[in-house]
Amino acid sequence: MSVLIETSLGDIVIDLYTEECPKTTLNFLKLCKIKYYNFAPFFNVQKDFMAQTGDPTGKGDQGQSVYGILGGSRYFPAEIHPTLKHVRRGMVSMAVAADASIETGGVSGSQFFITLGENLDYLDGKYTLFGEIAEGFDVLDKINEAYCDEQGRPFRDIRIKHTVVLDDPFPDPDGLVIPDESPLPTKEQLESMRIGEDEDLEEMGDPEELEKRVRAREAKAHALTLEMIGDLPFAEVKPPENVLFVCKLNPVTRDEDLEMIFSRFGLIHSCEIIRDRQTGDSLSYAFVEFENKEDAEEAYFKMQSVLIDDRRIHVDFSQSVSKLHKDWIAKRTGAGKESMGGFDNLTKRTRYREEGENNDKRDYDLVFDKGDYKRKRDEDSSRDRRRRDGSRDRYSSRRDDERSSRRRDDERSSRRRDDSREKYRRRNDSRDRHSSRRDDDSKRNR
């Protein structure tokens, strides 16, 4: 006969003395079963003595037995057993109601305490000892070390989060309503909160340092959000430092031209201009992967606002635009199955399935056998290949047309310049001939 109590500091398992104290253990089991203790605080902690809880309000003067909840008396008589002693740490006893007389045996409701010391024999015969801790002595150590005020209330809340009945030999009384899920804290319980379990008491000191901590927590939260929605493979991913993002490109700029321009800074592993999947048109940005980080840094400083194909480009590192290179990274996963984008230092967790892995059975709308599914996949692949080839042909044709048009314009301009020069030369020759005739006429007249 046991109960698991989940607290804000850890879990505790209590073994109950159901034969020696049947009425007390029945009361405790049924209160745990209806989640009566949920969100109840440890409101009285005396170091090396005891830790008291069981009052949902945390005031220390509230609470009632399961019999009172079912319409009976709020309290029930204590069950003092002469053979049960408070000799060890972790003994569990019912508290005595303040308005009851200890000499007459006392009465109890819902409050109980756990001993934090040994050989507390002066408690024997005064309180109903109905169980002992079987697991969770490390939690008792944490409770014993809690900082408390003068009344014994911990400054940082220590609360019961949940109770689980592991073994219950007693049938449920008539009228006992067991909730389907844990009830929400009441307004009175929320108002009794002090320092939350997740609040950091050490956040005191330099404001700049505190600001850094806050920003670090926010960044981690944002990264986890991006991981959940799929924008990041995992929250701790580090962007590659040897990859440059190049934007504001001319749509006619080719991959090989861009690679040739950037290759003067160092060896390039890949240079890819990102294109539209449907049309194959350039999206005017690219990623250039260098072998060394130093080469990427040099290219970053020297290629900023450089004119390429009549366009001034902008260069940045890829961590500034992590969303844009997601597709590019995904295409490189074939180079290293256990890495992100082919980089060894970007190892992805196996906690989630990677995109592209085990896709043979992702189609849940229709069920195919392996042969049918393979034929369907081959047809889809062939159709996609034809679509890509058509897109490339359209793009190549459009690019050739643009170059032909530019060549024709250059030829026309050259012809115009030649015509203008010929006209100018003829005009000068004509002037020279007229001038020579006038000189000859002048000489004859003399």
Curated annotation (Swiss-Prot):
Classification via PANTHER family: PEPTIDYL-PROLYL CIS-TRANS ISOMERASE-LIKE 4
Region: Disordered, residue numbers: 375-446
Biased composition (Basic and acidic residues): 390-446
GO molecular function, one term: RNA binding
Record's catalysed reaction(s): [protein]-peptidylproline (omega=180) = [protein]-peptidylproline (omega=0)
Gene3D superfamilies found in the cross-reference section: 3.30.70.330, Cyclophilin-like
Pfam families, A to Z: Pro_isomerase, RRM_1
GO CC, one annotated term: nucleus
Domain RRM: start-end pairs: 242-320
Enzyme Commission code: 5.2.1.8
Gene assigned in the entry: cyp13
Identification of the protein by name: Peptidyl-prolyl cis-trans isomerase-like 4
Keywords: Isomerase, Nucleus, RNA-binding, Rotamase
Signal peptide (from-to): none
PROSITE patterns: CSA_PPIASE_2, RRM
Coiled-coil residue spans: none
Compartments (UniProt record): Nucleus
Species annotation: Rhizopus delemar (strain RA 99-880 / ATCC MYA-4621 / FGSC 9543 / NRRL 43880) (Mucormycosis agent)
SMART domains noted in UniProt: RRM
Predominant subcellular localization, coarse grouping: nucleus
General function of this protein: PPIases accelerate the folding of proteins. It catalyzes the cis-trans isomerization of proline imidic peptide bonds in oligopeptides.
